Amino acid sequence: MKYYFLIVLIALFTFSCSTENKEIKPTVESVRQNLPPIPKSITLFGEKVSLEDEDIRERLDREIMANAYFHSQTILNMKRAARYFPVIEPILKEQNLPNDFKYLPIIESNLANVTSPAGAKGYWQFMPETGREYKLIIDDEVDERYNMSKATLAACNYLKNAKDSVGTWMLATAAYNRGIGGIKSDMKWQEATHYFDMDMNGETSRYLLRFIAIKLIMENPEKYGFDMKKIELYKPFQTESVSVAAPIENLALWAKERGINYKILVKYKLYLHLYN
């Protein structure tokens, strides 16, 4: 009996030592319970931004948790990003905008053609008057807010105009939510020129921090508990342009003659108001 007890103790001791000496690697499940620490700084729009202020860290912590633990929507955003970032990124580069702005339509619409309660539409969420101001066609037949390429170009022009007005890309991002006039007014009466030095309304005060949280998670998904090997990403749409010189009387027949159907035509031409 004594020998048996001694053997059990030796076995337990050996197991304990082997466990202590063995390096325990983080798993997806452990990461989900313990998110990585917030970095002391981040490169945003090509500039180093300090994240050491306690208030900023706590507010950013909230946005990281909100997105890291909202698995269904964050995974869906990753799937959609694989389809739409190849469209957005070349336009940003051509317009000399930082590549980070590809995350903005995730904040605005989760990369979906949606309509807000206020009436903003499309991936970049343009209101009708703002969309027309930035050269988007919006009428009874066409709504280019639903066209990713054209809406992205319009967003680039808005952001460049905003930066010229408020001075930095960070404030230009806030202006995309608050409006250029609203940010300029806040800057004036608060005598401030930096986003993190300003007291803003609830939505705008969270806007850039949500942007940073999305950037951190999308650029380091495994660190935040997303196993990219198991996520099936959406492929970019394969399309071709067809010139039309005259009105089309029967869209269903026109589509059929080109080897597709009306359903596919509607899917890829959401910015057209198609009627029977």
Regions found by a protein language model. Give the residues of each.
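Substrate-binding/active-site groove segments that recognize
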Residues: 119-140, 152-155, 159, 183-186
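Catalytic cores of secreted or luminal carbohydrate-active enzymes
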Residues: 202-225
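Short, functionally critical alpha-helical segments immediately adjacent to catalytic or ligand/cofactor-binding
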Residues: 97-114, 172-178, 265-269
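Solvent-exposed, acidic/flexible segments
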Residues: 70, 74-85, 94-97, 101, ...
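An acidic, Gly/Ser/Thr/Pro-rich helix-cap/linker signature
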Residues: 1-96
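LysM (lysin motif) carbohydrate-binding repeats in extracellular/periplasmic proteins that recognize
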Residues: 249-276
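Primarily a LysM-type cell-wall glycan-binding module
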Residues: 229-259
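Catalytic and binding regions of secreted/periplasmic enzymes and modules that target cell-wall glycans
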Residues: 159-186
